[in-house]
Amino acid sequence: MPYSTFPLLWVLGLLALSSACYIQNCPRGGKRSFPDLPRQCMSCGPGDRGRCFGPNICCGEGMGCYMGSPEAAGCVEENYLPSPCEAGGRVCGSEGSCAASGVCCDSESCVLDPDCLEDSKRQSPSEQNAALMGGLAGDLLRILHATSRGRPQ
């Protein structure tokens, strides 16, 4: 056997052995065949009392929601984890879940939602509206309403 074919056979043998190792390690159906099991989203906010709902959204009962603030900054790390997470809470809106009392969030934004009130079954619709209009959202609506009344139509 000439010496020029010996290196070629050696390289082919090495290639056959190394590719066999990769094939043995793969599960049936390929490396992505196992479904990703959902896990709890990362903790965030003051005292880690909230959960990440998106890369810039941190919400929790009793603390409300932080969007784009330093409290929600750690939620960006959720994008770099290989498996998906579930923030928890009841399903609301189109693809969201209840994040705090009266607030429904998905990975992009949050909206006020009466279905997310804690005692929504025991409250009348007028009480639900009053609860949603409390706090910062209610203050903003009152300011907008007051400024629109001052303008001539």
From Swiss-Prot:
GO terms for cellular component: extracellular space; secretory granule. The modification Glycine amide is found at G29. The keyword S-adenosyl-L-methionine does not apply. Keywords: Amidation, Cleavage on pair of basic residues, Disulfide bond, Hormone, Secreted, Signal. InterPro entries: Neurhyp_horm (IPR000981), Neurhyp_horm_dom_sf (IPR036387), Neurohypophysial_hormone_CS (IPR022423). It is found in: Secreted. Disulfide bonds join C21-C26, C41-C85, C44-C58, C52-C75, C59-C65, C92-C104, C98-C116, C105-C110. Its main location: secreted. One of its GO terms (molecular function) is neurohypophyseal hormone activity. Residues 1-20 form the signal peptide. Seven disulfide bonds are present in neurophysin. Pfam families: Hormone_4, Hormone_5. Belongs to the vasopressin/oxytocin family. PANTHER family: NEUROPHYSIN (PTHR11681), VASOPRESSIN-NEUROPHYSIN 2-COPEPTIN PRECURSOR (PTHR11681:SF13). Vasotocin is an antidiuretic hormone. This is Vasotocin-neurophysin VT 1. It comes from Oncorhynchus keta (Chum salmon).
